Amino acid sequence: MRKRRRQPSLAQLRAFAAVAEHLHFRDAAAAIGMSQPALSGAVSALEESLGVTLLERTTRKVLLSPAGERLAARAKSVLAEVGALVEEADALQAPFTGVLRLGVIPTVAPYVLPTVLRLVHDRYPRLDLQVHEEQTASLLDGLTGGRLDLLLLAVPLGVPGVVELPLFDEDFVLVTPLEHGLGGREGIPRKALRELNLLLLDEGHCLRDQALDICREAGSAGVAATTTAAGLSTLVQLVAGGLGVTLLPHTAVQVETTRSGRLLTGRFADPAPGRRIALAMRTGAARAAEYEELAAALREAMRDLPVRIVRD
């Protein structure tokens, strides 16, 4: 007779999914708020329950076994479905209550989050908003995998199973050192970008990709930047130090340029290069009506920002 296996617990699946994502016990434990011994024990218990080896452990690294490779996606799917179940139950209780896990890209978070947080505090006091700042690829993985509920980021995404709720459009502004010839000018033609030493964010930031697209549209063969930065604050200081120029979203200009007296901003001729910011949710999300209402409220709250509100 075939031995009856014990059913794996959600904690075991969550531990395995975290290790499969990070391939590192310490990072995986930190990601889900579990101690390393507890994480290791949960994965071992899952292996015993399933009767297969999921991980190949060495003194230097952790790898997924062939069985682990196959079952990691299934574990992620199960956790996403459980998350959707809890989400739907929360939505049935009362709108705008319970936990809302919001993912935000780094080039939006410092400049737009204050408006979001004020709105939630004033209008939705029973909503437990949890903010996660990550790059776009990580946010999308979190949304589709059920780790996050809603995203605030640049679009279009073009991702199946993800619905975009546009909020606003904003222009990019050229930031230069004081002595630069384009500093403070209005009506700068895009073709001027062909001759500029444009400083960019590191790989993985969507703002970097947008800047490269703008350069290509202007007729530049591409930017071979030898200097990059992990954040806009560092990027602006590099400009102030005379290493080049950069593009900033208009919402970031006041925060990032007032710290240095050695910067000027220039505006592009219409139509200026820019980006669209939106909320993004899973197709068929149980709380879709709430998210749409939140998007409408955010559009009204963001009228004082230097942006153009997108009416749904």
UniProtKB/Swiss-Prot annotation:
GO molecular function: DNA binding; DNA-binding transcription factor activity
Pfam families xref list: HTH_1, LysR_substrate
Domain HTH lysR-type: 8-65
One Gene Ontology CC term in the entry: protein-DNA complex
Protein family according to the UniProt entry: Belongs to the LysR transcriptional regulatory family.
Primary role: Required for the induction of a regulon of hydrogen peroxide inducible genes such as catalase and glutathione-reductase.
Entry protein name: Probable hydrogen peroxide-inducible genes activator
Organism of provenance: Streptomyces viridosporus
Name of encoding gene: oxyR
